[in-house]
Regions:
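A generic structural signal for beta-strand entry/edge sites
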Residues: 69, 81-83, 116-118, 161, ...
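Short beta-strand
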Residues: 48-51, 152-158, 203-207
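A short beta-strand motif that forms the metal-chelation/ATP-contact edge
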Residues: 162-169, 213-217
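Charge-rich, low-complexity segments
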Residues: 1-96
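C-terminal accessory nucleic-acid interaction domains of nucleic acid-metabolism proteins
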Residues: 1-27, 37, 41-42, 98-118, ...
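Signature for HUH/AEP ssDNA processing cores
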Residues: 83-158, 168-180, 292
């Protein structure tokens, strides 16, 4: 694909590192496609676009727009206008061509927007909390999920938080509704809050967070999204939402170390999420244990 304005700066240089251009973003999408596509392909995807870079106007595109690139697949979500999805490297580059800096897919089964295939717990710290507090919180969520017979994975968000993500089975006997998916995430989050009310809150309002980690379970309903693993972030520092092993989640972890300046070295390392889909388990026993 021929890029228009390939030298357009999308992220300014930082700490002696050069600016990141549209051509650089396209090269990243090409290099990381094998890691990104399993998490976005055939899923309705919202895109954060910044055609003039992160210093210009930024907007959230949910639906296909007139003249959408033919490399993007249209996904029917029973709405007036379909969503789009990148199903191959050409689709990812097309998103980059349009100034698409962030990928936020539904947590649904590929090809079936009505069936959830994962649960995301978004750990969002109050201003002033240390990242080590987020690390400790992620370990609490991990233990809770494992106690329920499920397998949690973890990633940076490209910002100040962490996501704990749980793959679930979608076969005919195991699949659950969006309502069940969200109810489970809420029940687990509330249980964690009750056990440690001084550390966690499930209240969205900023004023209620005072020194606590917000357990955001709201990313688990129909049409809700979460930033994809390996997605860039439209923020200073050109961070990437980076999949981690649990062994990496320890004191000293620096989420800003995963960015578009060093992705080549990151891609040479084994994928900590290579077993994400094979770790799926039915959510139904855990729902029963939570009284749902």
């Amino acid at each position: 694909m021929t890029l228009s304005s390939p030298d357009k700066v999308l992220w300014p240089g930082r700490e002696g590192r050069p600016p990141i251009t549209k051509a650089d973003l396209a090269r990243y999408y090409e290099a990381a496609a094998e890691r990104i596509l399993p998490h976005v392909g055939e899923r309705p995807t919202s895109i954060i676009r910044a055609p003039d870079g992160i210093g210009g106007e930024t907007f959230f595109q949910r639906h296909a727009m007139a003249g959408s690139n033919p490399r993007l697949k249209l996904i029917d979500v029973k709405a007036r206008t379909p969503y789009v999805s990148a199903v191959d490297v050409g689709g990812l580059v097309a998103i980059g061509q349009s100034g698409g800096l962030e990928l936020h897919p539904w947590g649904c089964k590929p090809g079936d927007p009505e069936v959830p295939d994962q649960i995301t717990f978004d750990l969002d710290p109050d201003e002033g909390l240390d990242f080590n507090d987020v690390i400790a919180a992620a370990k609490v969520v991990r233990r809770k999920i494992e106690d329920l017979g499920l397998t949690p994975f973890v990633k940076t968000t490209g910002g100040k938080g962490l996501h704990v993500v749980v793959p679930i089975r979608t076969d005919a006997r195991s699949r659950v509704s969006w309502e069940q998916n969200k109810a489970f995430a809420k029940a687990v989050s509330e249980a964690i809050r009750v056990e440690a009310p001084d550390r966690f809150t499930t209240t969205l309002a900023k004023k209620a967070r005072g020194g606590k980690i917000f357990l955001d379970y709201l990313r688990n309903g129909r049409m809700a999204t979460a930033v994809a693993p390996w997605s860039p972030r439209a923020r200073p520092g050109a961070g990437v939402a980076f999949p981690l092993s649990w062994g990496q989640v320890k004191a000293g972890l620096d989420p800003s170390a995963f960015n578009l300046w060093n992705y080549e070295a990151l891609l040479k390392k084994p994928d900590p999420w290579k077993d994400f889909r094979t770790a799926e388990a039915s959510l139904k026993p855990a729902l029963k244990r939570m009284g749902l």
